[in-house]
Amino acid sequence: MQTELFEVDPLSDNRKLYARAAEALGAGALVGIPTETVYGLGADALNPEAVARIFEAKGRPSFDPLIIHVHHGSEVEKYTAVPEGLKDLVHTLASRFWPGPLTLVLPKADIIPDIVTSGLPTVAVRVSAHPAMRGVAKALGRPIAAPSANRFGHISPTSASAVQKELGGSIEMILDAGACSEGLESTIVRPVLDEKGKPSLELL
């Protein structure tokens, strides 16, 4: 397989490119997509066969769940089943930290395939601050499952060239937006209800 590389010009309107990447994802392709933290290996999160290709390409164990990316915090309700007692906390976190490098682990909605969560009842959700990830997610109209775009156990890539070196020939497309601004994985927290039914946070 030949991996196509497309440059994302920060000074241009990239909507046609994002639409092209979204079309590829919709057809079951894998696409390397930049975020502000690291490059992600994207697949249509609602397509179990495409998600299975992520595990295959990365050599990732099937028991290791994936993060999903959505275009906007308002979409979280579609893909999660947050209990009433946690909704205010989740809304506060989303309003304060999204878009940005924060991942929330929340009870999943039935629409999310079990392969994404490795059979767990929760799903990790994020809204990236990078225009490429958000733009592709918006164009796709569905969540993007996207762990780091590298072989399992290797260093997470912060450039398109690193993605090409790791996964070139096993994925269809890479969007090259230069180096990631953060270069570190996102912070992961799980909102929970304590024994008294009060909302709190667990840092994962």
Where are these regions (language model features)?
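Active-site-adjacent structural elements in enzyme catalytic cores
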Residues: 1-204
